[in-house]
Every structure is written in structure tokens, then in C-alpha cells.
């Protein structure tokens, strides 16, 4: 039974944004990772056609876009994102770390199955208004 020890885990560059490093692993059915974002490094709003996603916030506070709604979430909150649901985040603190879990698609990287949205500016504006 594999146990991944925190002092043995190595962060690797994200597939979609190589300047961001993530600790990520893939099993047979799921892929998981520990992700830390700093202000300005978050991905733009997007959706996944094949992946459901869970995010458990370990530290930090953020504005969250889920579909047509925005809200805030902070350490201890668990977010579920159904597949095909447009979602995005904006950091309200300087840094945010979370544990992410998705069903596996592709080679197992967390950023695979990443689909851009056509109304990006509108969604970013919506996130900017959330306090």
C-alpha cells in the first residue's frame, strides 16, 4: 500500500502553467495534488468536460466562481465542482494552498481536461466583485 510521505514528495511543473509547481499523483481512477497559488498565478475560469473535481482548502481565503454564482471560501472548506461546470478562483490572501482530487483523464496531470471559456472577461469581472 503506497504511502506518500510529505518530506519525500516533490513538486513538479504544472502541464498548463509550467512556472507553477504542484505535488501531483495519479492512481487508476483518480488524480490528486497539493497546489499552492500566489496572487496573480491562478488559472483563468475554465471547465472540465471529463473531470469532476473536489478542492479542500488547507490555507488562505479565495473568491470562488461556480457556474453563475460567486462566493468566498477559506481554510477548512470543501468545494465540489461537477464536470462541465465553469469555475475559477481569485485569491483574497497573498497565497492559498489546497488539496485537489479529480477523476483521472489523460496522463494524470491535474491540469489535463482543461477547457477555456468564451466569456473570460465577464467571468473575471464577476470574481473581482466578490469580497
Model-identified regions with their sequence ranges:
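Short acidic-glycine-tyrosine-enriched beta hairpin
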Residues: 68-83
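Short beta-strand His + acidic residue motifs that chelate non-heme Fe in jelly-roll/DSBH
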Residues: 45, 64-65, 81, 87-93, ...
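Double-stranded beta-helix
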Residues: 3-5, 9, 29-31, 88-131
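Short, charged/polar surface micro-motifs in flexible loops or helix N-caps
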Residues: 28-30, 38-41, 61-62, 70, ...
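A generic "binding-loop/recognition-motif" signal
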Residues: 39, 50, 69, 85-86, ...
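A short glycine-rich, His/Asp/Glu-containing loop-to-beta-strand
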Residues: 10-45
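Short, conserved beta-strand element in jelly-roll/cupin
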Residues: 36-38, 47-64
Amino acid at each position: 500500500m503506497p504511502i506518500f510521505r510529505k518530506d519525500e514528495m516533490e513538486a513538479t511543473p504544472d502541464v498548463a502553467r509550467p512556472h507553477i509547481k504542484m505535488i501531483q499523483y495519479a492512481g487508476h481512477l483518480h488524480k490528486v495534488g497539493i497546489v499552492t497559488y500566489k496572487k496573480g498565478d491562478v488559472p483563468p475560469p475554465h471547465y472540465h468536460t471529463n473531470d469532476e473535481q473536489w478542492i479542500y482548502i488547507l490555507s488562505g481565503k479565495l473568491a470562488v466562481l461556480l457556474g453563475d454564482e460567486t462566493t468566498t471560501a477559506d481554510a477548512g472548506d470543501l468545494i465540489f465542482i461537477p464536470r462541465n461546470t465553469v469555475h475559477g478562483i481569485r485569491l483574497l490572501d497573498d497565497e492559498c494552498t489546497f488539496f485537489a482530487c479529480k477523476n483521472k483523464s489523460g496522463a494524470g496531470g491535474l491540469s489535463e481536461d482543461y477547457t477555456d471559456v468564451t466569456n473570460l472577461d465577464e467571468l473575471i469581472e464577476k470574481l473581482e466583485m466578490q469580497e
